[in-house]
Amino acid sequence: MDKLKDKVIWVTGASSGIGKELAYQLSKRNCKLILSARRKEVLEKVKNQCSNPKDVKILPLDIIEFEKADSYVEIAIDLFGKVDIQINNAGVSQRSLIAETDFSVYKTIMDIDYLGTVALSKAILPHFMLNNAGHYVVVSSLMGKFSSPYRSGYCGAKHALHGFFDAMRMEHEKHGVRVTMVCPGFVNTNIAKSALTGDGTLQESNDSATQNGLSTTNFCNKMITAIKKEKFEVYIGGKEVKGVFIKRFFPKLLHKLVLKSQVR
Ligand SMILES: NC(=O)c1ccc[n+]([C@@H]2O[C@H](COP(=O)([O-])OP(=O)(O)OC[C@H]3O[C@@H](n4cnc5c(N)ncnc54)[C@H](O)[C@@H]3O)[C@@H](O)[C@H]2O)c1
């Protein structure tokens, strides 16, 4: 039997890309889903394209409204009576050199990619502790394990997620809490299009590395396997995944290889 069947899974960033594909694949597995992102009408569309729309609820939210995190969690729990797995997937990327980036852009990226996830995760923690069970799945990035030019704020925020959630795992394993850090390489979504540039406007164009990345279908299939296995940390992508191991043992080599690859 599928271990995820009938689990209540809350996915943030479910309106597009990885989050949308997760909704489709998890619905096929008969999970009960709560889909969150900012735009209600887009979430409705994703819901209606799921295999089992009657088991899909939508909860529109802006992840940077930290003060509403407790009420979002209360609503999420009420929708099916509990939440088993929270998939923290909402995020925004960056394409700008440090010298050209307004400080406000760093704040926005940190708010969305780090603090928003911390707020929602912290708000649901009492529920997980009460149930003596709960699984945080956090969509970080290979950029949470090593860095690359044009993404300084994004790399900072994704690295920070590892710091927070590794501590979460240690503090709450005794309460049945699990943490899976998912680090994608290049996945073919619109992440580059919605990436912030130095003045905070969107890049509005795709880049070839992302477009040539894994399909969301292939990526989410692997991600779901990692969730089922309750992996601590997983790297999913093409040859760029090797960067994690090269950084660990040969940091100067990784530095040279990233500069040589000239991925913008
Ligand atoms: N695509 C890649 O190559 C890649 C690589 C590494 C990591 N990731 C990570 O995967 C996750 C999903 O990205 P994607 O590739 O599907 O891109 P995407 O742009 O298609 O999806 C991002 C999602 O986050 C949501 N979001 C953004 N800001 C939000 C906010 N303030 N409140 C609520 N929701 C918000 C968007 O609406 C969207 O649903 C992100 O965390 C991203 O950093 C993607």
Task: Go through each PLM region and give its residues.
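Substrate-binding pocket helix/loop in short-chain dehydrogenase/reductase
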Residues: L97-I98, D102-T108
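Residue(s) in the substrate-gating loop at a strand-loop-helix junction
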Residues: S141
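Conserved glycine-rich cofactor-binding loop
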Residues: S15-S16
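Conserved glycine-rich Rossmann-like NAD(P)H-binding loop of the short-chain dehydrogenase/reductase
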Residues: R29-V46
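SDR active-site lid
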Residues: K174-G238
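Active-site helix of classical SDR
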Residues: S121, A157
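The beta1-alpha1 cofactor-binding region of Rossmann-like NAD(H)/NADP(H)-dependent oxidoreductases
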Residues: P60-S71, F103
